[in-house]
């Protein structure tokens, strides 16, 4: 593992109501992150400058679950993992704000508007290799 992946970020998942359970929010501190601002890597590997773009790349794939995998976890297992989806909110630091309502989620987004972002895309590169990573993007 390189020295690039030393940062931590905090993701707040915005989990919509499923008809049985009300809308809820899940906080998770993601370790082993690299934060890149103003550039994006395209699928073909080329680098492109994109003003205001932010990409979090994490090697913490051990704690990552796809949206479906996360939804299928038993309730007592969900705190051990994170997922990432469009409209989730990422703070570019480890924070401990508690969010339980839509209003608190909006307040969190306002509080960290200069040090956070709403997710617009997620790329998973998990193949059981040392280079495995998940990219969480705002573009």
State the predicted function of each range.
Residues 1-20, 38-39:
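N-terminal intrinsically disordered, low-complexity, charge/repeat-rich segments that act as generic
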Residues 23-139:
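Short, conserved turn/kink motifs that form compact alpha/beta structural patches or helix kinks used as
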């Amino acid at each position: 593992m390189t020295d690039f992946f030393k940062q931590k970020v905090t993701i707040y998942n915005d989990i919509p109501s499923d008809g049985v359970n009300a809308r809820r929010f899940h906080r998770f501190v993601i370790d082993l992150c690299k934060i890149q601002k103003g550039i994006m890597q395209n699928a073909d590997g080329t680098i492109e400058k994109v003003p205001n773009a932010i990409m979090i790349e994490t090697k913490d794939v051990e704690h990552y679950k796809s949206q479906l995998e996360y939804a299928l976890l038993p309730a007592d297992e969900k705190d051990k993992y994170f997922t990432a989806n469009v409209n989730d909110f990422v703070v570019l630091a480890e924070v401990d704000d508690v969010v339980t309502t839509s209003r608190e989620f909006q307040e969190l987004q306002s509080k960290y508007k200069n040090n956070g972002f709403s997710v617009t895309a997620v790329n998973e590169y998990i193949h059981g290799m040392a280079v495995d990573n998940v990219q969480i993007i705002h573009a």
